[in-house]
């Protein structure tokens, strides 16, 4: 009887753990200097419910949307976030343009 009650008490918390968004940290060293798109040495990537992809600044914990789903969540007030351009680096090979987020979007999608 005690085991059944304990199991019933732990069951809801196990679902919460499974539903929690995954977060990984990526660095300039890991991704390569040529692909690195940010003004910081490392950032965190996460996938929130609905495949909303965000970059997180680990020192401030500010999150930045990197796909349309995430941007819509920020625009609607469902999530907090700042424009990604704040931490996006200029592309040295294409003056006036920012670095591509494609490798980071691809990596963040693996967390969904």
Which stretches of residues belong to each language-model region?
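Flexible, solvent-exposed short loops/turns enriched in glycine
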Residues: 54-87
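N-terminal secretory signal peptides
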Residues: 19-61
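Contiguous interface-forming segments/domains that mediate binding rather than catalysis
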Residues: 21-22, 39, 69-74, 82, ...
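C-terminal partner/receptor-binding element of secreted or periplasmic proteins
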Residues: 77-112
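Sec-dependent N-terminal signal peptides
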Residues: 4-13
